Regions:
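Glycine-rich, basic loop-to-helix element that forms the pyrophosphate-binding segment
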Residues: 62-78
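A conserved acidic beta->alpha catalytic loop
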Residues: 26, 41-49, 90
Length: 252
């Protein structure tokens, strides 16, 4: 891998006009400049595409609903050596891409890196416990089940290896395809957790039931998936009802 590899950032979008501009502006403020920004529209009926035109290097369209399908389209068309997904409600620290490149340059054996997610709306104390809980959950999951607690919004992958393992399984209805992809990648090298590689994301998926209660529920489901990785279906996963309301029948 080159010392300054091209990174492809893929942003799946479905009716995100209220938040998309802020996210794309944030990406454009990265200190690392060798990247391409790809927005994949997943059937928006609002102004999302027009907003994307102001910032994206490339806009693609995927008719089949679901973020996995949109991500897959983006990654398939990506030119970068490293591919990264960014949710439309996520924000990167300014040095986020720099940290990713530093991690990959430390060892050729590293095929993917990932880190924790913390909430934009929460305070430092709340996010400290979120970060702590995420780190502990990931450690225990790897020790007992050899499963990585990976979230697509903070997951960087060598494209060559992603292509080699066949990427995401877009035909599966099993929950958390990111966990399964990480397992496939780990057969070809090291999948590394970096606690300091933080992405800020919105707690909007959790607001209905309260953030704390929803976090406990999501941690429980993560463990359920880790211990029963081929049994938990998406219909029972914690984001299902949220995405149903957005009109995505099989968002994963």
């Amino acid at each position: 891998m080159k010392n300054q590899p091209l990174i492809s950032i893929v942003v799946p979008v479905l009716n995100e006009e209220k938040i998309l501009e802020n996210t794309l502006k944030n990406i454009r403020q990265q200190s690392y400049k060798n990247y391409e920004l790809i927005v994949v529209d997943n059937g928006s009926t609002d102004n999302s595409v027009n907003i994307a035109k102001k910032f994206a290097d490339k806009i693609l369209f995927e008719e089949k609903k679901g973020s996995i399908n949109a991500m897959t389209t983006g990654f398939k068309n990506a030119k970068g050596e490293i591919i990264v997904n960014c949710d439309a409600d996520s924000l990167y620290p300014t040095n986020y891409l720099e940290k990713i490149v530093e991690a990959f340059n430390k060892s050729e054996k590293i095929v993917a890196v990932y880190g924790p997610l913390v909430f934009i709306e929460n305070g430092k104390i709340s996010n400290f416990f979120t970060l702590l809980g995420y780190t502990i959950a990931d450690f225990l999951s790897k020790v007992f089940t050899n499963t990585y607690i990976v979230g697509a919004a903070n997951f960087a992958i060598k494209k060559e290896i992603y292509d080699k393992v066949g990427g995401y399984n877009t035909n599966s209805n099993l929950a958390s395809q990111d966990f399964r992809l990480a397992k496939k990648l780990s057969k070809h090298g090291k999948v590394k957790f970096i606690p300091s590689l933080i992405v800020l994301t919105s707690n909007r998926r959790f607001k209905e039931n309260g953030t704390f209660r929803a976090l406990l529920h999501s941690f429980k489901l993560w463990f359920d998936v880790a211990f029963n990785i081929n049994k938990i279906t998406y219909d029972n996963y914690y984001t299902h009802s949220y995405y149903q309301k957005k009109g995505a029948n099989k968002e994963k």
